[in-house]
Regions:
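Bacterial N-terminal signal peptides that target proteins for export
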Residues: 2-13
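Structural detector for short beta-strands of small beta-barrel domains
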Residues: 41-63
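Alpha-helix N-cap/helix-start positions at coil->helix boundaries
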Residues: 172-173, 205-209, 233, 247-250, ...
Length: 313
């Protein structure tokens, strides 16, 4: 990837991630639903522009991602949802000219009455509205199209495969969604090792972290089955390089956790060195835990060969 493309992708990712994946509800309840999860909330998913913001928001629909609408102009009843929201939940707000991705459900009516056409509520309350930024909105729209396409598959295996393939996308929001789903459903497999290895050098800390977490799941499964992952030694050296040299303490700590999962006694020496010399307390702590695990599971006399602290991966 060229420096210009990488810089552009990094800037776009930072801009969109701040407003989307770490939105106001993350602070309100500790963990917000992901963009992927939000798109699954409603039977209808659209992108639209707010034309009026009174008791009901009048929205001009610009694009329909999922479902069908009786009209290109829809009315959204949101004031009642604001009244009923839980403590700490942010208010739903609409502003003139604002563009949003909206997850919708038809407005409920009294039993026996006919639902009024083109009247909706937000599915998931405040999580049913994702505002489009002034810059980078096309990346968000592209992500919505792709994710809804995956979610619409009827075969669960096809959905899982589509989620894995998100890691190959250039759009960082799709990559982020891919990592979230792969980790949630433990979809990592040996075929993904070359792709995941490339993410160990990605400029985004979150992608390096996520790739290490997927590796931990893959190595854990391999260890439980008692089989050796193809290319496992090369992979361990790559992860060890991250543990020693990544600029992020959080990433280094995760690399240590991932190495611990491999259960290799020959990591004792390097873990001892990291436990005593890494500048970060959290990394030293994780290395100490890994060292304790190694010493508990394997007597020192049975070390065999070791990964030398001076060996260059």
């Amino acid at each position: 990837m060229s420096g210009h493309v990488r810089s552009t992708r990094t800037s776009l990712f930072a801009l969109l991630l701040i407003g989307l994946l770490a939105g106001p509800r993350a602070a309100a309840r500790g963990q917000a639903p992901t963009f992927y999860e939000k798109l699954a909330f409603g039977r209808i998913v659209v992108a639209g522009t707010c034309l009026e913001q009174g008791r009901r928001a009048l929205v001009q629909v610009d694009e329909v991602f999922k479902g069908q609408l009786p009209s290109q102009r829809i009315s959204i009843a949101y004031r009642g949802q604001n009244w009923d929201r839980s403590p700490g939940q942010p208010k739903i707000e609409f502003h003139l000219g604002e563009r949003s991705i909206l997850m919708l459900e038809p407005e409920s009516t009294e039993p026996g009455s006919t639902p009024e056409e083109a009247r909706f509520v937000l599915a998931g309350g405040c999580d049913g509205k994702v505002d489009l930024p002034a810059e980078g909105s096309e990346a968000l729209l592209e992500a919505a199209r792709r994710i809804v396409q995956i979610q619409s598959q009827s075969d669960q295996n096809e959905i899982w495969e589509g989620q894995r393939h998100l890691l190959q996308e250039n759009n960082p929001l799709l990559v982020e969604a891919g990592f979230q789903e792969v980790l949630k459903f433990r979809l990592g497999n040996p075929a993904m090792v070359p792709l995941l290895t490339r993410y160990l050098a990605d400029p985004h800390d979150s992608f390096r972290l996520a790739s290490l977490r997927v590796f931990a799941q893959i190595l854990e499964r391999s260890r439980q089955r008692g089989d050796e992952l193809p290319g496992a030694e090369r992979l361990r050296l790559d992860i060890l390089s991250v543990a020693r040299g990544d600029t992020s303490a959080e990433v280094r700590a995760q690399a240590v956790r991932t190495l611990k999962v491999s259960g290799r006694p020959d990591l004792r020496e390097v873990m001892a060195q990291m436990a005593g010399s890494d500048p970060s307390q959290i990394v030293r702590y994780e290395a100490q835990l890994a060292l304790m695990e190694i010493n508990r599971s394997t007597p020192r006399s049975g070390d065999g060969t070791s990964v030398s602290s001076g060996q260059k991966p």
